[in-house]
Swiss-Prot record:
Comp. bias intervals (Low complexity): 90-108
Organism: Epstein-Barr virus (strain B95-8) (HHV-4)
Keyword Coiled coil applies: no
Family membership: Belongs to the herpesviridae BDLF2 family.
Membrane topology listed for this record: Single-pass type II membrane protein
Gene Ontology cellular component terms for the protein in this record: membrane; viral envelope; virion membrane
Descriptive protein name: Protein BDLF2
Membrane-crossing residue ranges in chain numbering: 185-205
Residue segments, region Disordered: 1-21, 64-129
């Protein structure tokens, strides 16, 4: 079967003959120059699309793409042969050619009139010359249709105004819009990530750094109570070499009758105990204004305690009074004096020990005589000497670093208080 088509394109007449038996297409074209050409080719057999993409049409033109203008008039049909006298004579070939030429002339004139009307409409509406015509829009719509046809089967697109949104493919034929994640969620995720990163770096720098691990385990010194409850004992006396460790204040030793009583509750003759009694004896002599109290500093300076006149000497006497009174308070309540210095300045969760003076500690022994030449009484008893936590643990006191008299000389302190 042979189909013959006649098309008019821009003044060019093309005769197309296609055969369904072998699919060969024979075209006779008349170029604008008047030259006649013949083209033979085999049209490819169309294949149906597969999947959900088959629902898209390649040449779908949206409603917004329609160009306003007059409706094109239908092309005239080719003239039918006129039979005269019941099928006798017909018109000659010359008459047929003249009629075809007249038809082509009329068609070309109508096409030129439609083009002129479209140009006038665009000019009157303020549009620009050379705007895309309907053929260009048809080509754009066909490109969009082809792109949509190549989309995966689980995704389909829908044009809504000037925006294209993608929808999920569901089995019931309906689609749900994919919601984009909010930007606040993304910003919060980045913020949390960097916070965790900085916390991890701080943990590595401080938490797992061996230089910041103290060599002692603090035991909280509870607040003093009226019933004389015992304090705890520190488990260690070492101090790591880092700037966060508080240097112990030097507690002066007491020399009475050529016997030195050290703050670790030992003496120069190898005995144990007696530092609390020696400190109380110095407090009684100081409050009585006895002139037989001499102080020796770590810079080999010697001066009279009760007659200190210089600014540095008065500061040394005040520091000596504070540390001796604090040591007496701690020892009187059966607690090592190191506890006071470890927790001095720490928060209230560990409790605080009030800074006493000589008048406060003299209340522990109201029977002390005020004679400047009175002998030392070492039999000092405090409340609750017996019990699980009662008494001093001499083995731990011997390892105290405060027994070292080589205190650094960057700050002058009193090392010995001598009773002459």
């Amino acid at each position: 079967m042979v189909d013959e088509q006649v098309a008019v394109e821009h003044g060019t007449v093309s005769h197309t003959i296609s055969r369904e038996e072998d699919g060969v297409v024979h075209e006779r074209r008349v170029l604008a120059s008047g030259e006649r050409v013949e083209v033979f080719y085999k049209a490819p057999a169309p294949r149906p699309r597969e999947g959900r993409a088959s629902t898209f049409h390649d040449f779908t033109v949206p409603a917004a793409a329609a160009v306003p203008g007059p409706e094109p008039e239908p092309e005239p049909h080719p003239p039918m042969p006129i039979h005269a006298n019941g099928g006798g004579e017909t018109k000659t070939n010359t008459q047929d050619q003249n009629q075809n030429q007249t038809t082509r002339t009329r068609t070309n004139a109508k096409a030129e009139e439609r083009t002129a009307e479209m140009d006038d409409t665009m000019a009157s509406s303020g549009g620009q010359r050379g705007a895309p015509i309907s053929a260009d829009l048809l080509s754009l719509s066909s490109l969009t249709g082809r792109m949509a046809a190549m989309a995966p089967s689980w995704m389909k697109s829908e044009v809504c105004g000037e925006r294209m949104r993608f929808k999920e493919d569901v089995y019931d034929g309906e689609a749900e819009t994919l919601a984009e994640p909010p930007r606040c969620f993304m910003l919060s995720f980045v913020f949390i990530y960097y916070c965790c990163y900085l916390a991890f770096l701080a943990l590595l720098a401080f938490g797992f750094n061996p230089l910041f691990l103290p060599s002692f385990m603090p035991v909280g010194a509870k607040v003093l109570r009226g019933k004389g409850r015992d304090f705890g004992v520190p488990l260690s006396y070492g101090c790591p070499t880092n700037p966060f460790c508080k240097v112990y204040t030097l507690i002066p030793a007491v020399v009475i009758n050529n016997v030195t009583y050290y703050p670790n509750n030992t003496d120069s003759h190898g005995g144990h105990g007696g530092f609390e009694a020696a400190a109380l004896h110095v407090a009684a002599l100081f409050e009585s204004g006895c002139p037989n109290l001499q102080a020796v500093t770590n810079r080999n300076r010697t001066f009279n305690v009760t007659r200190a006149s210089g600014r540095v000497e008065r500061r040394l006497v005040q520091d000596m009074q504070r540390v001796l009174a604090s040591a007496v308070v701690v020892m009187h309540h059966h607690c090592h004096y190191e506890t006071y210095y470890v927790f001095d300045g720490v928060g209230p969760e560990f409790g605080t020990i009030p800074t006493p003076c000589f008048k406060d500690v003299l209340a522990f022994r109201p029977s002390l005589v005020t004679n400047c030449t009175a002998p030392l009484k070492t039999s000092v008893k405090g409340p609750n000497w017996s019990g699980a936590a009662g008494g001093m643990k001499r083995k731990q006191c011997r390892v105290d670093r405060l027994t070292d008299r080589s205190f650094p000389a960057y700050l002058e302190e009193v090392m010995y208080v001598m009773v002459q």
